[in-house]
Structures are given as C-alpha cells and as structure tokens.
C-alpha cells in the first residue's frame, strides 16, 4: 500500500488528528470561519459583513455591496452578520438570506441564497438559491421582491 498524501479533498482536523474527507480548501476555510463566528458571538455584524465584502474580488465585491444595500433598504428588520465567512442577513438571530462569492468557491457565478427561515414557499417546490453573474435593474427588482417576501 502506498502512503496517503494530503490533498485538497483530505484535511487533518484540529481535533484528534482525524481526517476530513471530501472537503475542498474553500469549504474547510468556510467551516473555520463559521467556528470563529460562533466563538465571537453577535459582535458588530455590520462591520464584519462590510469587512468580508471588502476582501472579495470583483465582480463579487460590487454585487455584494449592492445586495447589502438592497437588503438594508427592503428589509430593515434583518440584521447583517457573517455566516460561513460570507455576508448574511438574519431575523431573530436566524439567517434568512446570504450572499456567496463565486470566486471563493471557484464557481462561475455568485449566489444569493435563502434559508428555510425565508417565507418563499410556493406550492410543493420553489427555488432557494439564485445564480448571479451581474446585477441588472431587473435582477435588483427581483431581489428586492424576494427579500421582502422572505421576511413577510
């Protein structure tokens, strides 16, 4: 048998030296971010979100800034916080929606997602994640409507 080598799909965890199989480097980084968020508690979520947005590469950064502004305007009851190292927006401390930068996960698009706490139900099936390549006026209007519905 050949010795195992460390790849992006096999990481040593910090607890007990066990290997975490099936996680990419960005996924492992997101998990570490989440652990830091839980330990930090609900410190200044707005500042944390703005800092994470500032770290993003274009076009993710511009989209995240605009989505942040749309959410603040259309759903002021939501509070900004980070979630797995990405901007998220919560109601009663439960994440309702979040932005996921495409570059971080080597995806060809960013994502605006909604958790099961969002009121988006439409019959037996409905979308919860939306791919974003750019923010047009039509896309911004749809995001505004989705966010308002999610918190209704």
Pin down the residues of each PLM region:
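Charge-dense, helix-prone N-terminal extensions
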Residues: 1-152
């Amino acid at each position: 048998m050949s010795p195992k080598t460390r790849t992006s799909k096999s990481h040593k965890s910090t607890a007990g030296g066990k290997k975490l199989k099936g996680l990419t480097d960005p996924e492992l980084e997101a998990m570490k971010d989440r652990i830091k968020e839980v330990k930090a508690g609900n410190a200044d979520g707005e500042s944390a979100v703005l800092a994470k947005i500032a770290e993003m590469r274009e076009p993710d950064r511009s989209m995240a800034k605009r989505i942040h502004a749309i959410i603040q305007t259309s759903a002021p009851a939501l509070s900004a916080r980070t979630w797995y190292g990405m901007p998220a927006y919560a109601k009663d401390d439960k994440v309702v929606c979040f932005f996921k930068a495409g570059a971080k996960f080597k995806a060809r698009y960013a994502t605006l997602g909604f958790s099961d706490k969002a009121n988006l139900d439409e019959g037996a099936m409905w979308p919860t994640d939306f791919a974003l390549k750019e923010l047009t006026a039509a896309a911004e209007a749809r995001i505004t409507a989705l966010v308002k519905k999610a918190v209704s």
